[in-house]
UniProtKB/Swiss-Prot annotation:
Keywords in alphabetical order: ATP-binding, Carbohydrate metabolism, Kinase, Nucleotide-binding, Transferase
Taxonomic path: Bacteria, Pseudomonadati, Pseudomonadota, Gammaproteobacteria, Enterobacterales
EC numbers: 2.7.1.170
Protein name per Swiss-Prot or TrEMBL: Anhydro-N-acetylmuramic acid kinase
Function statement: Catalyzes the specific phosphorylation of 1,6-anhydro-N-acetylmuramic acid (anhMurNAc) with the simultaneous cleavage of the 1,6-anhydro ring, generating MurNAc-6-P. Is required for the utilization of anhMurNAc either imported from the medium or derived from its own cell wall murein, and thus plays a role in cell wall recycling.
Cross-referenced Pfam families: AnmK
BP GO annotations: 1,6-anhydro-N-acetyl-beta-muramic acid catabolic process; amino sugar metabolic process; peptidoglycan turnover
Length: 373
């Protein structure tokens, strides 16, 4: 069974940077050793957002973006290697999620698309890459997401305590880790995505640091109620979603009847939407003893405070308290999934995604042995 140092690369729906994590992994442990966040240039971020919101583009433009992101991911990996004074031969493999630009797991021809050419990552790092993790699950009738609940269970499952792990990225997803039961998990709806989109359009800021802007506003209850009536929130699991659904266009449609609303009030309402939609799903599943939060949204004090208020009797804390950085959880998960793929072990959970069977995930892009010598 392949063990050693792995690197995980994650660029999520928040588009707040490329997260790169170094970890030692074997069948008994995942030990994080280092991490960094690499910036995404504005022109690449704009290109990704345009695709996700259905803007027309040529195949040439898509191909260029695929190449540019692959090179960017390689730059991020090489920066971490340089910082840690490591060589390509010191790393078993890179697990790269890629950048999701479209996710449509239902319908006549279900599909998902992550870009960031893994061939360029191999060529510019000299390290084997495992990528394209989601499409096998979709081919087996699953949602292709979320994939992190298996990792949450491996790291944070408890023999007696009823736990849930909440990842608040651009989209929020919940993992249900109940003793004696199959792991379940699904996307609850928007996490940071709508909050980030609104403050970007209004203030040209990438995110609302410390929720300072939202704290100046008041929740617009009719707007909140209107947004919560979206059918996604009432849909049964397994389910998954992304920026192709919860995007700025979605927000604009809900704001048509609130054209005179104060921008700060809209931001406060979007923070409340994230907290309420998550809390509803926690309670719908019978609650838990501990809700462990990771992802960028775990650093939003308003969302965290509202979750604690909406979930009395449940301990709401970040995964940092359990010794796992909430900022690095997803990148770490894809390093772990790369290890499982190379070990010939399944990476999906049918109880989470709805796939017909558990399967080894991803495609392997081998490094040139000469490069690694």
């Amino acid at each position: 069974m392949k063990s050693g140092r792995f690197i995980g690369v994650m660029s999520g729906t928040s588009l707040d940077g490329v997260d790169v994590v170094l970890a030692a992994i074997d069948e008994t442990m995942v030990a994080q050793q280092a991490s960094l966040t690499w910036p995404i240039p504005v022109h690449l971020k704009k290109g990704i957002l345009d695709i996700c919101q259905g803007q027309p583009l040529t195949l040439s433009q898509l191909g260029q973006l695929d190449t540019q992101l692959g090179r960017l991911f390689a730059q991020a990996v090489n920066a971490l290697l340089a910082r840690q004074r490591l060589q390509p031969r010191d790393i078993v493999a890179i697990g790269c999620h890629g950048q999701t630009v479209w996710h449509e797991p239902t319908g006549e021809a279900p599909h998902t698309l992550q870009i960031g050419d893994n061939n360029h990552i191999v060529a510019h790092t000299g390290i084997t890459v495992v990528g394209d993790f989601r499409r096998r699950d979709i081919a087996l009738g699953g949602q292709g997401a979320p994939l992190v609940p298996a990792f949450h269970h491996a790291l944070l499952g408890h023999p007696t305590e009823k736990r849930m792990v909440l990842n608040i990225g651009g989209i929020a997803n919940l993992s249900l880790l109940f003793p004696g039961q199959a792991v379940r998990g699904y996307d609850t709806g928007p996490g940071n995505m709508l909050m980030d989109a609104w403050i970007w359009r209004q203030c040209a800021q990438p995110y609302d640091k410390d929720a300072a802007w939202a704290k100046e506003g008041q929740v617009i209850l009719p707007l909140l109620q209107k947004m919560l009536r979206d059918p996604y929130f009432a849909a049964s699991a397994p389910k998954s979603t992304g920026r192709e659904y919860f995007n700025y266009g979605w927000l604009e449609r809900h704001l048509t009847a609130f054209s005179g609303a104060d921008a700060r009030d809209v931001q406060a309402t979007l923070a409340e939407l994230t907290a309420v939609s998550i809390a509803q799903q926690v309670l719908l599943n019978g609650g838990c003893e501990r809700l462990m939060v990771c992802g960028g949204g775990s650093r939003n004090p308003l969302v965290m405070a509202r979750l604690a208020a909406l979930l009395p009797g449940i301990e709401v804390s970040t995964t940092d308290k359990a010794g796992i950085s909430g900022d690095d959880m997803e990148a770490l998960a894809f390093a772990w999934l790369a290890w499982r793929t190379l070990a010939g072990l399944p990476g999906n959970l049918p109880s989470v995604t709805g796939a017909t069977e558990a399967s080894v995930l991803g495609a392997i892009y081998p490094a040139n042995p000469i490069t690694q010598s």
